[in-house]
Amino acid sequence: MQSLQDKASVLSGVDQAEAFAIDESNLFDKLGLQTFINLSTNFYTRVYDDEEEWFQSIFSNSNKEDAIQNQYEFFVQRMGGPPLYSQRKGHPALIGRHRPFPVTHQAAERWLEHMQNALDDSVDIDQDSKIKMMKFFRHTAFFLVAGNELKNQNEKPKHKPQCACKHAANKPAEE
């Protein structure tokens, strides 16, 4: 059976070594807290202003300020900073936390488009860090897609086999 990380690599086109190159240096020390706050604010401004109703609806039950805080705290923690997210919310458990949302290929690509644009606008992040971060984000987005697909497979209703008798389908209803 293929692991979710392996499936994420296949779906995203980013192998695990590239995805986790963010661990080779401490991006939090390099970039600082405010850079992550600015990135998440820029990103969620784009998300909440998205013209595509199907995408915007994914976030309709989420408070924008909470989403910004959750994201930048997770990024800070994941990229070498203090465990802000875990201190406030517990283990990140990304798949579980994203369970209520329709994390599809299309949604992941749209999310990544907004993140790429937010990164492109971030003058405080050097190009090498942007590339490493985007590879991590792409792999992680498709890790969530793989988790969502697995969840959907496990939640499919189990139907009892119908009678495969060819005569039953053509039999006239009795009155």
Swiss-Prot record:
GO terms for molecular function: heme binding; metal ion binding; oxygen binding; oxygen carrier activity. Disruption phenotype: Slight reduction of the number of shoots produced by root explants in vitro; root explants are first cultured on an initial auxin-rich callus induction medium (CIM) followed by a transfer onto a cytokinin-containing shoot induction medium (SIM). Expressed ubiquitously, with higher levels in root tissue than in shoot tissue. Binds 1 heme group per subunit. Its cofactor is heme. It comes from the Eukaryota. InterPro entries: GlbO/GLB3-like, Globin-like_sf, Globin/Proto, Hemoglobin_trunc. GO terms for biological process: oxygen transport; response to auxin; response to hypoxia. Residues 153-175 are annotated as: Disordered. Keywords: Heme, Iron, Metal-binding, Oxygen transport, Transport. The keyword Chaperone does not apply. Heme binds at residues 85, 98. Homodimer when ferric. Interacts with RGLG3 and RGLG4. Hemoglobin-like protein that exhibits an unusual concentration-independent binding of O(2) and CO. May promote shoot organogenesis from root explants in vitro. Inhibits RGLG3 and RGLG4 ubiquitination activity. Belongs to the truncated hemoglobin family. Group II subfamily. This is Two-on-two hemoglobin-3. It comes from Arabidopsis thaliana (Mouse-ear cress). The lineage of its organism: Eukaryota, Viridiplantae, Streptophyta, Embryophyta, Tracheophyta. The gene is GLB3.
